[in-house]
Amino acid sequence: MGALKYVEEIQKKKQSDVIRFLLRVRCWELRQLNAIHRASRPSRPDKARRLGYKAKQGYVVYRIRVRRGGRKRPAPKGATYGKPTNMGINQLKYQRALRATAEERVGRRCANLRVLNSYWINQDSTYKYFEVILVDPQHKAIRRDARINWICNAVHKHREARGLTATGKKSRGINKGHRYNNTRSGRRHTWKRQNTQSYWRYR
């Protein structure tokens, strides 16, 4: 069993003394840094490697901080110009994950790189912190590697902005499996609908 397997097992138990201390110290450190900054190496190497990262030229890791909470509707003077049922401004829930937002912001910052994947590293009461794995499509080490050079095709430009990464597909309700396409209006809503008994009031 390799060393990263032990790291993975330690990381699984987030309530353990070791990880709680490590997360608390790292969270303080991340708060002092810029909202988007490049990391010299992944802080979770086991997770990064599972998502496709390789410690070689052409692979880059960026850390990003995203503010937690719902999305407030941008309505000047509270005017939404619609029916009263759609007048909401404050308690609206964004339909994409914060991780997707993180990927999109990093993708805009590093427009010449391609977003491969991302993962959670930390959170506090105000922010969530993610690491985003990016690939340089111009680098020879990437273009010559048959396992990753698919990302060099122009069709994969800004895949994070079009919901083509793992987290983007999740919020779009796209997955594999028999009749998965029947998950109308979200997987949680589908589960609730299929596990709730409803009766006529007068029966």
Swiss-Prot record:
The keyword Ribonucleoprotein applies. Keywords: Ribonucleoprotein, Ribosomal protein. PROSITE patterns: RIBOSOMAL_L15E. Residues 166-203 are annotated as: Disordered. One of its GO terms (biological process) is cytoplasmic translation. GO terms for molecular function: RNA binding; structural constituent of ribosome. One of its GO terms (cellular component) is cytosolic large ribosomal subunit. It comes from the Eukaryota. Residues 193-203 have a biased composition (Polar residues). The keyword Ribonucleoprotein applies. Belongs to the eukaryotic ribosomal protein eL15 family. This is Large ribosomal subunit protein eL15. The gene is rpl15.
